Every structure is written in structure tokens, then in C-alpha cells.
Amino acid sequence: MPKLTFLGTGTSTGVPQIGCKCKVCTSFNPKDKRLRTSAIVTFENGKRILIDCGPDFRSQMLSIPFAPIDLLLLTHEHYDHVGGIDDLRPFSFKRSIEI
């Protein structure tokens, strides 16, 4: 069965949002510190699909063990979903990634 790993579940500006004084953004609870939305689907054969690659991608990937990415699925072209594409280079060194 494929495994879904959420790398980020925040808004397009992340959580906390800069300058926001709401209860969530001022919370000290680690669950209220969320990077922008992204996920990885890992299949039983080891293949991995990255869903969106926002500006938090580098930090997200440093938080999990390194493994190849076989395909990038972009849900739409907003910066919070594509802003980390340049950080895919370590994953595409001497191999290609389908987009």
C-alpha cells in the first residue's frame, strides 16, 4: 500500500504568518508551526512522487531521510507550489525527474 507523507500543511504564507497576532500564529505549540503544503507518496517498489515543491522544499527534505524522487506532480503554478523547484537539483543529479 502506498504511504503518504505530509511535508507541509500550512497556508500559502506558512504558519505562523508574518505579522499575524491570531491565537494560532502566536501559539507556542509545535503543531502550530507549519510549512507550506507538500507531500510525498512512496510506493512499495520504492518509487516516490513529490506533490508540489514550494519555497519550503529544502527545509522539508532536510527533515526526512534522503531518497530519490521519481516524479513531481504540480497541482498548480502558484509560487507556494513551485518556488522550490531549483532545490530539486540534488535529486536530479545524473538522473531525470518527470514533471
Model-derived features: where do they sit?
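Active-site metal-binding motif and surrounding structural segment of the metallo-beta-lactamase
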Residues: 46-99
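Conserved beta-strand hairpin/beta-sheet module of binuclear metal-dependent hydrolase folds
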Residues: 2-63
